[in-house]
Amino acid sequence: MLYLLSELSGTLTPLNVFRYITFRTGGALFTAGFFVFWFGPWIISLLRLRQGKGQPIREDGPASHLTKRGTPTMGGLMILAGAVVSILLWTNPHNHYVWVTLAVTLGFGAIGFYDDYLKVTKQSHKGFSGRFRLLLEFAIAGAACLMISLYSPAGLQNQLAFPVLKDTLLNLGWFWVPFAAFVIVGAGNAVNITDGLDGLAIVPVMIACATFGIIAYLVGNVIYAGYLQVNYVRDTGELAVVCGAVIGAGLGFLWFNAPPAQIFMGDTGSLALGGLLGSIAVAAKHEIVLAIVGGLFVLEIMSVIIQVVSFKLTGKRVFRMAPIHHHFEQKGWKEPQVVIRFWIIAVILALVGLATLKLR
């Protein structure tokens, strides 16, 4: 919305600053952060009042988690509210990628909200049918990928780019849409699986958002894309503003989610944020790089898959408990140790992901 003020720069020159993506990214970050920080206590009080017992805690989990009983969930509403308000305020309203990303984020957020609602009202870890949930996620992601394909440059439609390999594209044809949808759905559920300890998911999400904000900005700038010899995808630079808004909202949320957490983001937040990361990676043609930058999320969801498959085939478990962050807790690591060490891993993976831009 504020971007439109730049159209008056001919009359009032200082308004030209609203054309700059970097300026609006900073504005989006501070706006979202202030929104969540200011309204956070009120939202937490309201959710605590409405939910009563809060998020159900696993009885088979680490004993230290039992002290978290009564903590409200659905904190993703705080993140989404702050991010969406900021995105609408600071992005170019004519940018198609912004609207597609918002649609995925809010769609996944709605699915997560309903799942959280069922868990809280039933005081059970089981939300609604996993198959139906996946069906809804793929429907939303598939529609988004069709739109992204239409908006992509002619030479990049349905193409999969490979990091490090210069000018190497794989034409997936009709298979690109289901592949890209899988990336988005996979990202959403991987972040969802990771959200099991105070602060564990939100910081890696912010790190990944910062990384993909940089990638989207560079890929969407014809000069930088040419210098780095990466595929130029027009208009994706605006997604850096979206990433800035999410980082700001994440910082505001972390203020209340820092241990001991006053609120959990729940599926409302984790599904939405993962879907957002996936859609940005797909739009920027850096799907494979997402697996590197979001390697922590990949590790978490793969630990669950390995555990389930191993138990069904052999009757034995590979990990003491899945997801893998609980495995380390069962080995004696304190919760802050697990969280901070996983943050360090996320930072390292983000740097590796950024390095792929230059290594050609």
From Swiss-Prot:
Associated pathway: Cell wall biogenesis; peptidoglycan biosynthesis
Catalytic activity: UDP-N-acetyl-alpha-D-muramoyl-L-alanyl-gamma-D-glutamyl-meso-2,6-diaminopimeloyl-D-alanyl-D-alanine + di-trans,octa-cis-undecaprenyl phosphate = di-trans,octa-cis-undecaprenyl diphospho-N-acetyl-alpha-D-muramoyl-L-alanyl-D-glutamyl-meso-2,6-diaminopimeloyl-D-alanyl-D-alanine + UMP
The family this protein is said to belong to: Belongs to the glycosyltransferase 4 family. MraY subfamily.
One Gene Ontology CC term in the entry: plasma membrane
Transmembrane segments: 27-47, 70-90, 98-118, 134-154, 168-188, 199-219, 239-259, 263-283, 288-308, 337-357
Protein name (record): Phospho-N-acetylmuramoyl-pentapeptide-transferase
InterPro entries on file: Glycosyl_transferase_4 (IPR000715), PNAcMuramoyl-5peptid_Trfase (IPR003524), PNAcMuramoyl-5peptid_Trfase_CS (IPR018480)
EC number: 2.7.8.13
Highest taxon listed in the record's lineage: Bacteria
Record localization: Cell inner membrane
HAMAP family: MraY
